[in-house]
């Protein structure tokens, strides 16, 4: 399991600790990841994802998991999140076709 947000793609960064004397030592900046259970309204299921705190704020800002995944680009999502996105698109298309018929 990599230290990467499944929704935003936020991952580990590498930089330096810089002392007062300007000595530099390598360090890693780890993302603030949390195991979160998010509910899909369209699919009617709960999904457990590893999401950064900033990613969770983005999900809430966009109005939930479904809205976030529909607006997100595929290249920043994890494989599992891409699958969820495709399922949501398929389900909404089926619902729209049922209403039209």
Swiss-Prot record:
Sample GO molecular function, one term: structural constituent of ribosome
Keyword field: Ribonucleoprotein, Ribosomal protein
GO terms for biological process, alphabetical: translation
NCBIfam families: L28
GO terms for cellular component: cytosolic large ribosomal subunit
Encoding gene, per UniProt annotation: rpmB
Domain of life the protein comes from: Bacteria
Keyword Ribosomal protein: yes
Entry annotated with the keyword Heme: no
Protein name: Large ribosomal subunit protein bL28
Family to which the UniProt record says this protein belongs: Belongs to the bacterial ribosomal protein bL28 family.
Annotated HAMAP family: Ribosomal_bL28 (MF_00373)
InterPro entries listed in its UniProt record: Ribosomal_bL28, Ribosomal_bL28/bL31-like_sf, Ribosomal_bL28_bact-type, Ribosomal_bL28_sf
PANTHER family cross-referenced by the UniProt entry: 39S RIBOSOMAL PROTEIN L28, MITOCHONDRIAL (PTHR13528), LARGE RIBOSOMAL SUBUNIT PROTEIN BL28M (PTHR13528:SF2)
């Amino acid at each position: 399991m990599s230290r990467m947000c499944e929704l935003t793609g936020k991952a580990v960064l590498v930089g330096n600790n810089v002392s007062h004397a300007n000595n530099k030592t390598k360090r890693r900046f780890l993302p603030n990841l949390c195991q979160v259970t998010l509910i899909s309204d369209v699919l009617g299921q709960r999904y457990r994802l590893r999401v950064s705190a900033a990613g969770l704020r983005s999900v809430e800002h966009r109005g939930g998991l479904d809205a976030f995944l529909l607006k997100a680009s595929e290249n920043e999502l994890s494989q599992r999140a891409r699958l969820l996105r495709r399922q949501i698109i398929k389900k909404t298309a089926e619902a729209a076709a049922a209403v039209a018929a």
